[in-house]
Amino acid sequence: MSRGLGDVYKRQNAKYVKLAKKPVTKKVAVVAMSDAQFEQAMKNEGFPESYKQSLRALHSAYPYWQFKAYKTGLDWNTAVTEESKTGVNLISNARAKAWKSTEKDAYDASTGKWKVFDGSTWVAASKAAVAYFMDPRNYLNDRSVYMFELLEYQSQYQTKSGVNTILSNTPFYNKKFSYTDVNTGAAKTMYYVTAFMEAAKISKASPYHLASRVKQEVVTSATTTSTAVTGTVSSYPGIYNFYNIGATSSSTPVLNGLKWASDKKAGTYLRPWTDPYRSIVGGAQYISSGYIAKGQNTCYLEKFNVTSYKRYSHQYMTNVEAAYEESIKTKKAYAGMMDKSPLVFSIPVYENMPAANSPMPK
């Protein structure tokens, strides 16, 4: 489920988008820090005391990992209030009442029913739910910390086997697709895993992030997908949208996304996406140039945009749980690979945060 992806950025004349220089250096020295060095590093970064115990546990298990404080300069309550505005963050209507907003424009007290904002089940999230999913301290563990991982492509540990792990139990695992070479016009076939690796090299975005995003956006079971990637929607035949780009919240998000993907006049990001290759690679270019290069270079910042660029808007997904869900998928992809990998995590720090973590809604 996506939101805010209908924004079309500056037209690119080349077939491949030239990316802006990244604000964070990708190459990291593979050196394990001692406990004393790590304590000094946390102090230098300015992490609050309420972050440190969880970070110590992560350092103990993964001494090669580095943790950077992303100082937002924003008041915590203000940020939560902005992200809690009706329609900005959605949650499944199947959740208990405490997770769902009861504001007048989100809930009808006379009928006891919630207003649906997307599809048939997505309603406005409560302020308590937003605070719970937005509080970085709730996710400083080796299961969900990946929402803070920097999303630039790092070839030293991001491999085909890792992408295959993400694609396992999906219709894309060990499968080929047909496409037309964007340079020669020749008909070819390619494995999906190869397409994600090529997309990473071209866009400079993490292939694990790209594969995880596609898995969340369009995979509906081990054998089925959304119609966004079948090329069979009658109003947009032969059009594919693997990342659901342009699928803004409405009663017909898939059609909105396919309309965006079919835009021949724009000519950007390899559009129109007339085969899986164009969609996977072109979509990666869009995500990288439109989000990562704008400073939204973690899953957390793509979900909760607390950067200076279009703050509190330009958010990739409306699903308030999306960053957490993608983090779990990344964890599975990394299994057995991470002990000595030089991952870098950028963790938001807000002003005036409560001493205790924001609790789960009850």
Q: Language-model features: where?
A:
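Extracellular, surface-exposed passenger/stalk and repeat segments of large secreted bacterial proteins
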Residues: K10-L19, R213, G257, Q285, ...
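Short, functionally critical alpha-helical segments immediately adjacent to catalytic or ligand/cofactor-binding
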Residues: T194-S221
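Short secondary-structure boundary segments
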Residues: L151-Y157, R213-Q216, T223
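Solvent-exposed, acidic/flexible segments
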Residues: Q156, G185-V193, S203, P207, ...
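Positively charged, low-complexity/disordered segments
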Residues: S2-G6
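Catalytic and binding regions of secreted/periplasmic enzymes and modules that target cell-wall glycans
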Residues: Q216, T223-V349
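Cell-wall glycan-active module
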Residues: D7-S203, I292-K362
